[in-house]
Amino acid sequence: MKTYVLKVEPFTKFDEPKAQALKPLEEAAEVFGAWQASGIDGAGSITPEMREDIVYECFDTIQSCVNLLESIGTTDAELRDSARKVYANNVERGRYDPY
């Protein structure tokens, strides 16, 4: 199974709490916009620029989620526990075979 290992440094300055919580939603909408603009749904071929835009917006979403986690004081242990739970749920849903 392919696994992405990323280094994401959380911000040290945060927006007010509601704005911080809304940021991942805003960034996720930008991912959808980039995907929509790419025509990747089968209507056409994706250009390298469009692919780069999708990847950029996905990472921007990851960054905003990491910032939110940092702003509420999330620990590594909490992240590992949540990762295990999400993995188990996805196996249960048949999204991939367990390793």
Regions found by a protein language model. Name each.
Residues 1-99:
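Flexible "arm" and connector segments at domain edges
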